[in-house]
């Protein structure tokens, strides 16, 4: 009798384990990191909205399996990004990692990915140039352009159309905004433009008084490479100090993470020229459909405090997740042999994204279209970016040969030099 009970009990346990195993096999675990704390919280929240739109667009399935999402929070620092990635990869055992959001995080996650060759990492939205250009990881894929690519066309537009010949810059002191200023300077300076002062501020700066006092008066415009709470704090304090210079915006200075902020300080951005991988008022039907899907989501979860329209972070996370899900569909969820088929599908993908066609170069870095924009107030009274120019097929070296591009140096506080020609 006892032996029979033991056999029955063992059979029940075996059946339960088999059932759990089969249930797990019906799911694909996707790990996602986002800046859900600190200066860039609003950016991380909108990134997650973009991710959720991609899950919805694929009916919650990829490669014939149900998508299970595990989210880990970061604060935009490299250490927090690696901690989050380690949890997802080493504890939660995710199948694919979509990470991270911010520039310095990207370099750290690239390096971490080299220690975990069994996992494929798809960049969420980070935009430092070094992430994919310097010693790239063979398992790291980026479907968004970097910060320099996101400024293609801006230098030409401010010099030749707006007639700004001398500018100063204020930007956050880290890899992404180094890359943004790098892209702006290369184009603007070759045309004859001058950057008379470059000011760098730490992420999370609360008091901009000394920075504002250091701004030169004899410039045609000031470039602002700020984001999130930093952008809003600067605008408030700049207006209180009586600042009235013409402004040029970085990619996350003039998207909905700032244009939808509370208060009147954002009004100073009306007329601001900027450049980015998207534009709020892009007339492209695919973009309009994407924006509508964002706007009509139920106001719950991440969408409870959604913006009037998707930001650069939303479209970047959407595209990254969409690429993952499409590649998984293509290989029918096959992640065997160190993701070989899956990675081949990612590498060769032509992503017909809401913000234009995206392909990858030899370093698995995005090539796509860039949008030069101007901030306007629309018929609803919302601030939005309208398209004034589109630059297609923007590659990471910005038209330079590898030899010349490498001689210019990596983006930094003083790189590139502002000059009319580069070796």
Where are the model-predicted features located?
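Solvent-exposed, acidic/polar segments of extracytosolic/periplasmic ligand-binding ectodomains
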Residues: 28, 347-423
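Beta-alpha junction/loop-to-helix N-cap segments that form part of ligand/metal-binding clefts
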Residues: 42-47, 57, 61-133, 143, ...
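Sec/Tat signal peptide C-region and signal peptidase I cleavage site
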Residues: 19-24
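Extracellular/periplasmic Venus flytrap/periplasmic-binding protein
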Residues: 80-83, 129-132, 138-242, 281, ...
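Venus flytrap/periplasmic-binding-protein-like
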Residues: 74, 122-130, 203-204, 244-266, ...
């Amino acid at each position: 009798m006892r032996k029979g009970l033991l056999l029955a009990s063992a059979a029940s346990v075996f059946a339960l384990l088999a059932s759990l195993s089969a249930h797990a096999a019906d799911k694909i675990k996707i790990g996602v990191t986002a800046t859900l704390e600190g200066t860039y919280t609003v950016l991380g929240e909108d990134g997650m909205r973009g991710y959720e739109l991609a899950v919805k667009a694929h009916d919650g399935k990829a490669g014939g399996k149900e998508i299970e999402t595990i989210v880990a929070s970061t604060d935009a620092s490299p250490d927090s990004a690696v901690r989050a990635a380690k949890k997802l990869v080493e504890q939660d055992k995710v199948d694919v990692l979509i990470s991270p959001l911010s520039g310095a995080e990207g370099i750290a996650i690239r390096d971490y990915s080299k220690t975990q060759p069994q996992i494929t990492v798809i960049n969420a939205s980070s935009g430092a140039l070094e992430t994919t250009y310097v010693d790239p990881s063979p398992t790291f894929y980026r479907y968004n352009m970097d910060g320099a690519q996101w400024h293609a066309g801006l230098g030409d537009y401010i010099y030749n159309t707006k007639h700004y010949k001398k500018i100063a810059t204020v930007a956050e002191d880290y890899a992404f905004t180094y890359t943004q200023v790098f892209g702006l300077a290369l184009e603007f300076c070759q045309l004859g433009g001058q950057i008379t002062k470059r000011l760098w501020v730490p992420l999370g700066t609360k008091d901009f008084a000394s920075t504002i006092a250091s701004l030169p008066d004899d410039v045609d415009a000031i470039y602002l490479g700020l984001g999130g709470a930093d952008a809003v704090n600067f605008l408030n304090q700049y207006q209180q100090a009586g600042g009235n210079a013409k402004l040029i915006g970085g990619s996350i200075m003039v998207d909905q993470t700032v244009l939808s902020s509370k208060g009147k300080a954002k009004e100073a951005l009306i007329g601001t020229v900027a450049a980015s991988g998207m534009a709020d008022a892009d007339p492209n039907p695919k973009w309009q459909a994407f924006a509508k899907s964002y706007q009509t989501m139920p106001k719950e979860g991440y969408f409870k405090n959604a913006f009037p329209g998707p930001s650069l972070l939303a479209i970047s996370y959407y595209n990254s997740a969409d690429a993952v899900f499409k590649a998984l569909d293509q290989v029918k969820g096959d992640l065997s042999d160190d993701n070989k088929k899956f990675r081949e599908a990612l590498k060769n993908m032509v992503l017909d994204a809401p913000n234009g066609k995206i392909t990858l170069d030899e370093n698995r870095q995005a090539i796509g279209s860039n949008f030069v924009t101007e901030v306007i107030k629309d018929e609803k009274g919302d601030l939005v970016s309208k398209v004034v120019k589109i630059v297609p097929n923007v590659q990471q070296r910005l038209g330079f040969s590898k030899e010349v591009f490498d001689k210019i140096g990596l983006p930094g506080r003083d790189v590139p030099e502002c000059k009319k020609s580069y070796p």
